[in-house]
């Protein structure tokens, strides 16, 4: 429960109800702080709002309102805060509070088509805000966050990825991944086949790369982060050698692929195959993969 004290007159508390089966997740990327309940598209959200008055005190206001908001913040553009979703309920008409009050509230079948996201330059957050309207003296507000995750239907078509790449007369390889769409706890299975090897290879690695694009115009930014470096071969291979690939995605901090969310941001993922020779030259081939959510949490 969250609480804020306003002077010596009153304090307010805001709580989202969650049953014993409700899953929770950290709001922050560093997995610190409090965990928040996870909801999905169309699910009801309910809770309580409490205004506690000190004995003998009264409190004038111009209405008490509860709002449920979906908001996108572009962190490198402080002016670019966008509420893509908002619904509100009036809890109390203008007047005086002369005693403490508790309000039970509920938002039914809430449309939550976008997932919560906390990236490098973008935040998509959902929260409930208690708003006590005070006129010229400034409103009193309290917010509490919750997380939205949405399950996906397994893709009907999931083709393998197969490519031949190389450097003329020096290196020619064929690589294959078992599919192009993976759930967040999936395993990437594949192989790398060396058709021609005329350079001395030091090692080969497989990287998972996340690319976040956000903003428009002069505020458009692209952030690329390498989430993992997984060595799959040490030493130089011979012609016709086949190197197996098995990469477990569950060990990485991944989200589903997000495409042009509210025309504000996108998140894509890539598998990057990198070969390093003995002179530290790097040869790579990047291939996009599609990620989707199979389970909550």
Curated annotation (Swiss-Prot):
Q: Which GO terms describe its cellular component?
A: cytosol; endosome; retromer complex
Signal sequence coordinates: none
Record's keyword annotation contains Protein transport: yes
Give the keywords, sorted: Protein transport, Transport
Q: Which Gene3D superfamilies match?
A: 2.60.40.640
Q: Which GO terms describe its biological process?
A: intracellular protein transport; retrograde transport, endosome to Golgi
* Pfam families named in the record: Vps26 (PF03643)
Superkingdom of this entry's organism? Eukaryota
Into which family does the record put it? Belongs to the VPS26 family.
Known function: Plays a role in vesicular protein sorting. Component of the membrane-associated retromer complex which is essential in endosome-to-Golgi retrograde transport.
Report quaternary structure and partners: Component of the retromer complex, composed of VPS26, VPS29 and VPS35. As part of the retromer complex, interacts with the sorting receptor SORTLR/sortilin. Interacts with GTPase RAB7.
Q: What is this protein called?
A: Vacuolar protein sorting-associated protein 26
State the species of origin: Plasmodium falciparum (isolate 3D7)
């Amino acid at each position: 429960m969250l609480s804020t004290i306003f002077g010596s007159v009153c304090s307010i508390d805001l709580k989202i109800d969650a049953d014993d089966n409700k899953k929770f997740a950290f709001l922050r990327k560093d997995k610190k702080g409090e965990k928040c309940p996870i909801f999905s598209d169309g699910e009801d959200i309910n809770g309580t709002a409490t205004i506690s008055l000190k004995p003998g005190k009264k409190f004038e206001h111009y209405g008490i309102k509860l709002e449920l908001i979906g908001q996108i913040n572009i962190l490198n553009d402080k002016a670019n805060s966008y509420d893509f979703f908002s619904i509100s309920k009036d809890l109390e008409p203008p007047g005086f509070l002369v005693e403490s009050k508790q309000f039970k509230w509920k938002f039914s079948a809430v449309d939550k088509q976008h997932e919560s996201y906390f990236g490098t330059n973008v935040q998509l957050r959902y929260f409930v805000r208690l708003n006590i309207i005070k006129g010229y003296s400034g409103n009193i507000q309290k917010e509490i966050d919750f997380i939205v995750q949405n399950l996906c239907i397994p893709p009907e078509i999931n083709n393998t990825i197969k490519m031949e790449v190389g450097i003329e007369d020096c290196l020619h390889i064929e690589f294959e991944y078992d599919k192009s769409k993976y759930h967040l706890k999936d395993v990437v299975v594949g192989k790398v086949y060396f058709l021609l090897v005329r350079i001395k290879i030091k090692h080969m690695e497989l990287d998972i790369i996340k690319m976040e694009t956000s903003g428009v115009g002069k505020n458009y930014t692209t952030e690329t982060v390498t989430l993992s470096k997984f060595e799959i071969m040490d030493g130089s291979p011979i012609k016709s050698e086949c190197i197996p690939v098995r990469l477990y995605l569950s060990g990485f901090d991944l989200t589903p692929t997000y495409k042009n969310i509210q025309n504000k941001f996108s998140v894509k993922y890539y598998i990057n195959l990198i070969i390093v020779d003995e002179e530290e030259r790097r040869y790579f081939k990047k291939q996009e993969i599609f990620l989707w959510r199979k389970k909550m949490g």
